[in-house]
Amino acid sequence: MCGIVGYIGHREPSKIVIDGLRRLEYRGYDSAGIAVHHNQNGIDVTRAVGAVDKLDLLFSQKVTDEEARIAIGHTRWATHGVPAERNAHPHMSMRGTISLVHNGIIENYETLKKKLVSEGYEFKSDTDTEVLANWIEFHYHNIYSEGDHDLALAVRLALKDVVGAYAILVIDSHTQQIVAARKSSPLAIGIGSDEFVIASDATPIIEYTRDIVYLEDGQMAIIELHSQMNGGNPDVTFINLDNEVINPEIEHVDMELDQIEKGGFDTFMLKEIHEQSETVWNCLRGRLTDGEEPLMMGGVENVLPQLLRANKIFIIACGTSWHAGLIGKTMIETLTRVPVEVDYASEFRYRNPIIKPGDVVISISQSGETADTKAAM
């Protein structure tokens, strides 16, 4: 499950966004990225495969605009396209006008992409998110042809064409705004006295404010940073996709960070037990679609031929990952009739298993750092 963080206000935005992404690491990810709005110098994007610390290192090597006040960031689990820098968020539109981070799945992205290709658009990634960034830009430039940089209108028009689930943050190179919108994917707006922090959940927000709006489906937030002549502080307008102004409830969050991370439960175990149905749904939502490709195999395309030709599959893991492997064994054998063996990684590495040409070994590790599993591989 991906993570989103955005900031607009008087502090250094890149630090708040990167620190916020660290707070969301528990959600899991394979790559991370940040886009910073450099006032008159456009939008700068930094992306990295691997840990948020790697992103932080890459970003620290850049010369940044000390006057920047807007940034958006993202941690990604691959669904459309392999884990690679080109597929990481934020995505830029072809003309460099729009930058976007997105959680969810755009089910009709192929239809939108064909339309964009017919309009001369080219794509650098394998993702549905880049399609959405360009679809917003397509509307944005149609609006600008009439003399207006109306980012919120472009987002509204684009989303009316979208089928699927999304939580998005959008910035453009011409205005000092973040536009946020959601459908079937969580998004929280933290409201400070002179700043706003936007995130997938409250964990990156509560250090800066305890007043939070949780967007509902079909709602948008337009957060604009005013010029110094107009006070220099940001404000927010909440609307729906029909451009009707709404007044959502502002919740004051009293829970501490560890309580928020536990979702109100006493332990992480209870939280994870109660989240199972939602977690399974989120996993499937990124893999199963009604499009021309009903099964999305993002992250494993490079080894898909070997998987399809497998004579036998070995799954190695530890702890709860081992239990997940047992479920995988049942499903794989039922659906494919390929035999599967599930082993504890700590035993697999010592027992000299019989692995023949054409067999496939799959390791499972929630953290990616389980020592026995890495040693067994």
Predicted regions and their residues:
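Glycine-rich phosphate-binding loops that contact phosphosugars or nucleotide phosphates
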Residues: P305-M377
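Conserved short alpha-helical segments that host acidic/polar catalytic motifs at enzyme active sites
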Residues: M1-K262, D266, E275, W281-N311
